[in-house]
Amino acid sequence: MAEECNKLLEFPSVVDRYFKRWYKSDVKGKPCEDHCILQHSNRICIITLAECHPLLQNGKTIKTISYQISANCSRLQNKVSGKSKRGAQFLTEHAPLCRISSTDGEEYTIYSCIRGRLLEVNENILQNPELLKEKPSTEGYIAVVLPKFEESKTVTEGLLSQQEYEEILLSRAAVGSGTVSAV
């Protein structure tokens, strides 16, 4: 009985309990630049970096994060109001959300990966970029996007489920170790 009380119970995290993970691998043809989309049952999607993104690997240090996409477009200028989210910027699958540079000179562009309205960007990562590395699925998210109601069921077409993504990671590891097996 005492052993049962002392036994640690494994509960799923809040993210795993309320969100379904979807992945986009090799975004824009760039190897290993994977994004994760957390989809809630209420349609809201949170864009994050996938665990295997190069920024989260190899001890990289983040130098700057910029939501300034072009001279006329800053994601920080997104002002949303009202029930129908008036004023929200509309995003396509290939719309850039932010640019992140590391101290080794690499620059990564993070894309929306889904169509919808930009509800908010995470301004906390501007002051504390390490949140991206320390808590990529929670406090280190990139942006919150709301797909159109009529597209909410099809928004994940072209994205990978967690199981499909894990299979891709295994195949990358096999290629990296030189032990590719015939399918």
Swiss-Prot record:
Residue stretches spanning the membrane: none
Classification via Pfam families: GCV_H
GO terms under cellular component: dendrite; filopodium tip; growth cone; lamellipodium; nuclear speck
Species the sequence originates in: Xenopus tropicalis
Gene3D superfamilies: 2.40.50.100
Entry's family note: Belongs to the ABITRAM family.
Subcellular location(s) per record: Nucleus speckle; Cell projection, Lamellipodium; Nucleus; Cell projection, Growth cone
Keyword Transmembrane belongs to the record: no
One GO-annotated biological process of the protein: regulation of actin filament polymerization
Keywords: Cell projection, Nucleus
InterPro entries assigned: Abitram, GCV_H/Fam206, Single_hybrid_motif
The keyword Transcription is annotated on this UniProt entry: no
Protein name: Protein Abitram
